[in-house]
């Protein structure tokens, strides 16, 4: 009894220590770069949604958005803090980051006995480096939490744990349906793996039924929204249908394989970084294939295998899909955590002569690839950032971002004063929360081509809002002419040309500015 009590005390102390470490790391990162950088693009997309939820609007129904969970999380914390500004949003995201980092470090610490503090510090540094970009910290943390859910099931596959694991998968899907899909795939593989050479209950069928019931319970917030929130069910299914229409979840980019690095035209630093990025992309696939083969082989031989390795093995390929869906470093960072967690858990149990050189190598590679992308580095000492005020907070941002913010404020003062609406399309959803305005258009981030019916509805919304000015960022995204706004939304573009007057003197030829006629 004493031994069991002592063991529980140790686990509680260990968890508390890791929570303190996780909080310290995130707090230190926030101090370093919380006031640095600002994106009118993706970060603005999240910020607009959080602001609109604070005002009573519903994600997906009232504005284009991610899945609802992250907006309600952000809105609740921002409401508690009495602030709807960008720093309040970043604070809400940072709290979620603490949860993700804690889960990751706790799983690594539990993967072997007597884990050293030095190893956990290195693991924390590696995970924190890859926690980028900050507006995607929900997604990164969810990928870590999914690993934890599967480990929870693998350690003790009881009936209750099948149900609870399913419930967690459903709840994860409230924050992101893609994570729910990845969690479902990983869960099915784990449940099949658990049945190998296993005679006790629950078997695969009963376990699956319990798990599926849990998924329904976990996803209940969205299911209830489809039943109780007027108009939500239609837009929810439309958002799913649209994915099948465009046949993609992202705009693809070529995979930056190591052999595609233009060694003759880049610096040594950039060449090394390019090779490392390509190797990490290969690693996400290679780890998934070899780890699955390893854990299945060990299972057939009835040999023990670390639960973290099993969980990461079956999540690696689903998350590699996300990394490859738009093959840049930002999406690699969101899909790499099964690889990182699997490697860190595997190395933790190795002899010192293998563990330490390997973890230092992983740390160095992560530092080389990721450090230059963090806002704290980009606006650090000697970097050319300028100070601007955004929602009552002083931010250090790149000069072009400051120029864009100044332009939007100038246009609003001249053409849309006293809270009058405006349109900023297709890439600047952050313009609306920046100026505390509601977007006339539902589609605040207009990346994909839309059909005639959709465009006509948007035109009616623009007509009803009577915007004072419209700014069209005429950019061929990824160098693709078909992705210019006039090609993805030709009816809306023609409506603007027919009903608004061009404003001369644009600071950038790509910024097509129109004022109300």
PLM regions: where:
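Extracytoplasmic catalytic/substrate-binding loops of multi-pass membrane glycan-assembly enzymes
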Residues: 34-49, 60-76, 83-87
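Membrane-interface helix-loop-helix junctions at transmembrane boundaries of multi-pass membrane enzymes
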Residues: 198-210, 287-313, 324-327
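Loop-to-helix entry region of an early transmembrane alpha helix in multi-pass inner-membrane enzymes
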Residues: 68, 72, 82-102, 274-279
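Hydrophobic/aromatic-rich transmembrane helices and adjacent perimembrane loops
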Residues: 181, 324-357
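Hydrophobic, aromatic-rich transmembrane alpha-helices
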Residues: 102-103, 274-303, 341-346
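Transmembrane-helix motifs of polytopic, lipid-linked glycan transferases
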Residues: 91-113, 148-149
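Membrane-interface alpha helices of multi-pass inner-membrane proteins
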Residues: 126-128, 162-177, 183-188, 217, ...
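Short periplasmic/luminal acceptor-recognition loop of GT-C membrane glycosyltransferases, typified by
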Residues: 393-449, 458-463, 467-481, 506-514
